[in-house]
Amino acid sequence: MALSCTLNRYLLLMAQEHLEFRLPEIKSLLSLFGGQFGSSQETFGKSPFWILSIPSEDIARNLMKRTVCAKSIFELWGHGQSPEELYSSLKNYPVEKMVPFLHSDSTYKIKIHTFNKTLTQEEKIKRIDALEFLPFEGKVNLKKPQHVFSVLEDYGLDPNCIPENPHNIYFGRWIADGQRELIESYSVKKRHFIGNTSMDAGLSFIMANHGKVKENDIVFDPFVGTGGLLIACAHFGAYVYGTDIDYNTVHGLGKATRKNQKWRGPDENIRANLRQYGLEKYYLDVLVSDASKPSWRKGTYFDAIITDPPYGIRESTRRTGSQKEIPKGIEKWEKCPESHVPVSLSYHLSDMFLDLLNFAAETLVLGGRLVYWLPVYTPEYTEEMVPWHPCLELISNCEQKLSSHTSRRLITMEKVKKFENRDQYSHLLSDHFLPYQGHNSFREKYFSGVTKRIAKEEKSTQE
């Protein structure tokens, strides 16, 4: 606990959305900006109030310039489980740390924030008046104050059982707000070019933050689709590149996915999406390519690989190959004329993730991150099913439920070891290999569950 004694304490007000993704995002961003995650709290769970120890206010501000999981951050001056405990805590806070924000030439206002309860205006004023013992010497300015102070009260998580008194009360100086507005400004609904599986804007930014994407990075998406993940990375100043096996998607051709629109327009493509947000300068290129047969020379090119592989549900899992599928087929492929159109074959999920991890291990710089979605059949899921590679360390594993029996997990891995040729076969010796192959039947299990649910609904309506 020595860390919390030497560092300033801050209060994070978290959004109550994507709860499992919040802690890995904050840890990744603190690491990115040179901070170390430290807290006096034993658990965070679903609570929106987190007390953190952060080295400096600059790091706290940088954190809020990136996070979409946190709403605001405050310099914590005091907290307690009752008003009396709060006031006692405030009286013990060093006066020399308060004075720069309370002097006579300053302006301020005090806000009351409650979680899971609404207070009347009279109750709010009563709480503000109770803070008169603090040495405020400045003038109140409700419109444009220099400093904003907040009283935050936590009434628990159960909306059906709201206590009379709060569980915890906090008081602090507001530092900055997070980037929650990006979720709306980059909404897929407003985007020029979209597809059936375009990634939600909020999740795209979370993935970029988990991947520690930063300015001047080179970020690659091997299953780029309509480029939603590239947009989030480009927003943070990274140069983006992608590939996809679907010619029509890469070139913006074919049928449109929007309602009341039959065909895609001539300017519906990934580059146009980046142009829409003023990010075209970060566009490197997007190519038609097969992820199972990378066309890259050996070397480390990418600072991060951020991707959402197809699961075989709304987008098919495909790769190029020969109908005969014999080892010599690769040699024949190399001799084929340029006009040859390759056969499209099914791409097993276990093979897809094996190829993805090998590719990441070979092309990521040391310390670079791989962030991808792993679909799972919930009743059979175990941690052993998460793909493993000797060059990659698992950083986080977060679940997003899709249905009662399926979910997808956001896997973040970091390259910690230089790639060697023998590493691409290490999975065969791992205890994880057999459970890992269970991903191949995800599509069948998914639709099996859908069929059972439809039959159950039809039966209930008939009754």
Swiss-Prot record:
The keyword DNA-binding does not apply. GO terms for molecular function: tRNA (guanine(10)-N2)-methyltransferase activity; tRNA binding. It is an enzyme of class 2 (transferase). Its main location: cytoplasm. CDD domains: AdoMet_MTases (cd02440). It is found in: Cytoplasm. The modification N-acetylalanine is found at residue 2. It catalyses: guanosine(10) in tRNA + S-adenosyl-L-methionine = N(2)-methylguanosine(10) in tRNA + S-adenosyl-L-homocysteine + H(+). Its EC number is 2.1.1.214. Keywords: Acetylation, Cytoplasm, Methyltransferase, RNA-binding, S-adenosyl-L-methionine, Transferase, tRNA processing, tRNA-binding. One of its GO terms (biological process) is tRNA processing. Gene3D superfamilies: Vaccinia Virus protein VP39. GO terms for cellular component: cytoplasm; tRNA (m2G10) methyltransferase complex. SUPFAM superfamilies: S-adenosyl-L-methionine-dependent methyltransferases (SSF53335). Belongs to the class I-like SAM-binding methyltransferase superfamily. TRM11 methyltransferase family. Part of the heterodimeric TRMT11-TRM112 methyltransferase complex; this complex forms an active tRNA methyltransferase, where TRMT112 acts as an activator of the catalytic subunit TRMT11. Catalytic subunit of the TRMT11-TRM112 methyltransferase complex, that specifically mediates the S-adenosyl-L-methionine-dependent N(2)-methylation of guanosine nucleotide at position 10 (m2G10) in tRNAs. This is one of the major tRNA (guanine-N(2))-methyltransferases. PANTHER family: RNA METHYLASE-RELATED, TRNA (GUANINE(10)-N2)-METHYLTRANSFERASE HOMOLOG. This is tRNA (guanine(10)-N(2))-methyltransferase TRMT11. It comes from Pongo abelii. The gene is TRMT11.
